[in-house]
Each structure stands twice: as C-alpha cells, then as structure tokens.
Regions:
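Acidic donor-binding loop of glycosyltransferase active sites
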Residues: 275-292, 305
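Short beta-strand->alpha-helix junction loop in the catalytic core
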Residues: 169-170, 188-206, 255-256
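Conserved donor-binding/catalytic core segment of Leloir-type glycosyltransferases
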Residues: 18-21, 164, 209-228, 234-238
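A charged, aromatic-enriched C-terminal amphipathic alpha-helix characteristic of glycosyltransferases
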Residues: 34, 342-381
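Short His-centered aromatic/hydrophobic patch
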Residues: 107-113, 134
C-alpha cells in the first residue's frame, strides 16, 4: 500500500457504508458471473463518491478488489434452488458484528432479503434501509426445476425500499405472474419498488477507432442455454452452413469440444474477449424467455460488432434502431447481408456505437442510483437524546475514536437498542466524519 492510500484512509469523509449481499449463479468462473460484472461496474462508476462497500463473497473475487471494498467470506451452495434457500443466521450475525457500520443494505438475492433483514433488525444493532438488484426470477415459463422460488422472491422485494430491474419488459412479467398470488395492493407496492435500470456502457469502453475491417465471424456470446434459444440458433447455423461455408461461429461460453465444423469456443481474459469481438462481423441476439437486458449484446456493440436481434420488446428497449427478425428466413437474410455487404455492416456498426454513447451511458444511471442511496439514507431515522449528545462530546474530546472503542467504552447496551439511528445523528453533525476504510472511525473536524 502506498503513502497516498494510507493518507486516504485517514481523510475524514461523510462515508456511506453499503453491505452487499451476493447472487452467484456462475461459480465455474466468478469473474464472469453477471452479478460480479454488474457490481464491479457500479463500484467503478461511483468511485468518486464516499462509499465503502462490504461485500459478502463465496471466495475472494479479484474483480471486486478496490481501495474502498472489503470481502467477507460467505459460502453459498452452487445449485441455484439450494443457493436461494440456504441462509445461515448465526454465521451472518457473526459476520456483520457490532464493530462494523452499515448505512444501507444492497441485496442482489431477493429470496434471502427477509432472512437478512430479520437477522439484522432482531439479532444485531443494525437497522439500515434496504435497496436491491434483481438478477433472476423463477418465471413459470422459464423455471426448469421442480419447485420454484418466485413467491419467496416477491416477499423479499417487499422488504426493500427500492429494487432495480433490467428492463420494463421484465418488470411487466414480474407483475403479471405476481397477480396469480398476491392482491392488488401488493401489486401496486411491487410496482413502486421495482425500478428499471438499464445496464448501459461506460463511455471509455466504447470503441473510438472505427475500423471497417473484420473477419467472417458470427458471435453468440450469450450463455448457450435453452432460455437463450441456443439449440434453435445452432439449427439456424446448420442451415446457413448448407448455403455457404465461408464463416465461423464463436460461442465463448460453450464448454466441451465444439461439435460442428464451423463452431469455435476460444477462451480469453476480458481484454482478449473484447479484442476478439472487434474482429467479428455480426452478433446474434436470440429470442429469450426471460426478457432481461443483454449485456452480451452491448459488449459486442461497444467493441464495434453490430447485432441482429430477435423482435422482442426487451431488445427494442436496448436499441430500437437495430435490425430485427422474427422468422428463421429473416435472420438468414440479415446474416447473409452482413457477411456480404461490408459498407452496410460498417454503417450499422457506427449507428450502434453512437446510440450507446448518447442513450445508454451507464454513468447517468449510476448518478440516479447514487441519488437514491442518498435519499434513502437521509430518510433514515436519527436520534436526538442525552445519549446522542454524550456520544458527540466523547468524539469531540477524543478527536477520533473507532466504532469498536465507542461501543465498548461508552455504549454498553443490549441488542434491543439500535445503533443505526445514533450513527445517523452522528453523521448528520457538521463536525463529525467517518473514514473510507473497513473499520469505522468517528473523527471530530472543526473545519
């Protein structure tokens, strides 16, 4: 750690402390898990804010290792239905402890949010507001296991003040299925909680050198699963292969040995993945049962690869100006045009990157989310009591004191008395600050 980093840890700030609860569905490669990618981009875009992130992780994840993060080990089962059911109350209580502070909980796993809040509020001193991010719903037409967790997901959402969701299409699907189980008052509450947040791209990630050169590669960089219509895509590629044999199909997430002469599943690190996308002629965005945002599509577009897209509302939300198909023949006609007409392909490449830059700038979404953070924290109840004034005087006299010291030496109350309102009162005081570090420290600053 360099001197600058040491100094940064001692700088008084009005730190916002966020506890992040994970949702891991791709344990084969945690760095590529969609939750990890989303959270990493959030932290990067909010790096200039005074936020410290405490992240529960099944193992250390390099991609979430920043100056303003810590990772606490929290094991989760790998099978999704087991992962959504398993919650170790006593281990969670020990992890969050009394020595840490949390102004906000961000739950990426709605199915656990009730257990999470129940444990925090009833077994610890913490009572923070809860915000969420929904990565997955067990929709009736998608769920492949014998018993779904949809109702548990909805009950978890109802514990939140706000929960972000990828697309309006997906939100509509949630509300529609929820009507089968919940009354209209609850549906209205869900409608208020669920907030569409598009997963845009960072401006600096958009290709700036517009080169029309490319290879005749069709990329399918989605998960090769049934809910992404992978089988139907391969059948379409078989038909295209019957027409012409001058192309390859790259499916980077395909495991095992490719079983077609045109298939490749080359693996790269993230930069290598981006570099490979730059060489592709066209990407394929399939019909999907889930209605979510396609990070795979924006990955390709920002690297200069245009995509043809299934004519679904979720893709129109991403870019209404793309080339859409509804039938196999329409898809084949479009693929042939992109493979043969370099000028047209280059035109669509340019239009796509311009759209990303002007309409899907992730920084704008993150500024809105940060304001949501501030609004929720500002609405957290604070105390105004003799004990509050006593704590203020202690911090003033000591100059600085850690949360552990303050709690052990001057509080001494049971878990029935909640700390969060006292922290809120301290942080609202004009002369009291925290530090951007894993250990909370209250600092008196007259400036």
């Amino acid at each position: 750690m360099n001197i600058f980093e040491l100094d940064k840890e001692l700088i008084p700030t009005k730190t916002t402390r966020v506890l992040v609860y994970p949702n891991i569905t791709w344990q084969k490669d945690l760095e590529q898990d969609s939750y990890v990618q989303v959270l990493k981009n959030m932290i990067r875009e909010l790096k200039d804010k005074d936020i410290f992130w405490t992240i529960l992780s099944p193992q250390h994840i390099d991609g979430l290792d920043f100056d303003n993060t810590e990772q606490l080990m929290w094991e989760l089962p790998t099978y999704p239905p087991a992962m959504r059911s398993h919650f170790d109350v006593m281990k969670f209580k020990k992890l969050v402890g009394h020595d840490r502070d949390f102004d906000l909980v961000m739950s990426h796993l709605p199915e656990h949010t009730h257990q999470l809040v129940n444990t925090l509020y009833n077994l610890t001193h913490h009572t923070p507001k809860v915000i969420g991010y929904a990565h997955w719903f067990d929709f009736d037409h998608v769920c492949v296991w014998a018993k779904d967790s949809f109702k548990q997901n909805i009950c978890g959402l109802l514990e939140m003040d706000k929960c972000y969701i990828n697309t309006q299409t997906q939100k509509n699907m949630v509300l529609e299925q929820a009507r089968n189980h919940f009354n209209l008052q609850t549906i209205h509450q869900l409608d208020e909680i669920l907030t569409v947040q598009y997963l845009g791209v960072k401006e600096e990630d958009i290709l700036k050198e517009y080169e029309p050169e490319h290879e005749k590669i069709i990329v399918f960089n989605h998960r090769p699963e049934s809910y992404k219509h992978y089988k139907e895509f391969i059948q379409l590629m078989d038909e295209l292969w019957e027409q012409r044999k001058d192309f390859t199909v790259w499916v980077p997430l395909l495991t095992g040995e490719p079983d077609r002469p045109y298939l490749t599943n080359e693996k790269f690190d993230k930069q290598g993945y981006y570099d490979k996308l730059k060489t592709c002629c066209v990407g394929f965005s399939p019909k999907q049962k889930y209605g979510g945002w396609s990070v795979a599509t924006t990955d390709g577009m920002m690297n200069g690869c245009p995509y043809i897209m299934y004519d679904g509302e979720y893709y129109h939300e991403l870019w209404d100006g793309a080339d859409f198909f509804t039938t196999d023949q329409e898809a084949l006609d479009l693929l042939n045009r992109y493979l043969d007409d370099s000028d047209y392909r280059f035109e669509m490449q340019m239009l796509g990157m311009h759209h990303l830059s002007t309409k899907l700038n992730y920084k704008n979404e993150m500024e809105t989310m940060y304001q949501d953070f501030c609004d929720l924290i500002n609405n957290t109840k604070s105390t105004n009591s003799d004990k509050t004034n006593e704590l203020i005087e202690v911090i003033k006299d000591r100059g600085s004191i850690t949360k552990r010291e303050l709690f052990n030496e001057y509080c001494g109350w049971g878990r029935g008395i909640k700390w969060t309102p006292y922290r809120r009162a301290l942080m609202e005081h004009p002369n009291i600050y925290d530090v951007n570090n894993s250990e909370p420290k209250y600092i008196w600053s007259a400036s």
